[in-house]
Structures are given as structure tokens and as C-alpha cells.
Amino acid sequence: TRRSSDLVGEIGLDYYWLKTPEERANSRDFFDAQLSLAEELNLPAIVHDRDAHRDCLDIVRAHPGVRGVFHCYSGSLEDAKVLVDKGWMLSFTGNITFKNARRAPDILRWLPLDRLMLETDAPYMAPEPYRGQRCDSTMIARSAETVAQLRGLTRDEVEAVTLENGKKFFGIA
């Protein structure tokens, strides 16, 4: 029986810091093994993907039995559609409030609400107007406001649906 705290993650690929082909290959191998473990144990995964969208998606595709959430999602709309079709959730941080968040608006307008989660990624990713400051949970309302504006909803509606999605994901609903 799965307990609400049982999951695999945070796992994934972060090419921002890994520059050599050897480092990246090693990271891919570990990520693949971690998804294999999630598949074997039938546990959801929390995936970190920074500057490694193609490789991350390819490895996830190789594990069709795994579901979970891509945290701090920054991929494309096309990749979002693939992930949602495979049963994944997408979580967004304060970076959706940034002026240079070019991909996020289209994704957030398209994304089925039952696949949406919000997070702080504290202490990083503080939303505007707090960008550059230490992020904390009080700031998540700014991200919810951004989603609400894009979707024609109220902030309360966005907060309610993302709270419910989080409870379901973590098995505490």
C-alpha cells in the first residue's frame, strides 16, 4: 500500500551545471535508473528538468509506466502535451510571472486544470515583484494570480484547484 510520502524524487536532469558529455551521460544513466526504480515500485516521480528538455522527455518516454509531476516546468507547449497525454502533471513556480516567461502563458492557457500544480521552489524563483529575493510560501499567491488572469478565473479558484491537485498527487485528499 502506497503511503502519501512514497515517491521517487526529486530526480531528473540539470544541464545548466553539467557541461561535459561525460557528465551529462552519467546524469542520464542515473535518471534512467531512478525512473526504473519508480516503475518497479509503482511510485510517482518528481522530475527536475533544467536545460535538458529533449533528453529528459526521451528518458521519460522510455518508462511509460511512470507518472508524476514535472516541477518548475519550463519546457515547450508541444512537450507539455506529450507529458499530459502520458498522465503527467506540470507544476509552475514564480518564474511564470517574469517578463521573459514566453512559453508559460500558452501552456497555462492550454493545460487542463486537473494537471496543474503550483509551487514556490523556495528559496528560489520568487515571483515578480519579489524577483531576486528569497522565495517563501506566502508568495505563491502571485503565481496563482498570473494563472487566474490567463485562464479567466479568480485567484481563489486557481488556489482551490491546485490545492486539490496537490492533495491528490501526494495521496492526502
Identify what each model region corresponds to.
Residues 24-117:
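Catalytic pocket-lining loop regions of alpha/beta-barrel enzymes
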Residues 12-14, 89, 97, 123, ...:
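Catalytic metal-binding/acid-base residues of hydrolase active sites
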Residues 37, 139-173:
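Mid-to-C-terminal alpha-helical segments outside catalytic/metal-binding sites
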Residues 21-32, 50, 134-141, 156, ...:
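Non-membrane alpha-helical structural segments and their capping/turn regions in soluble enzymes
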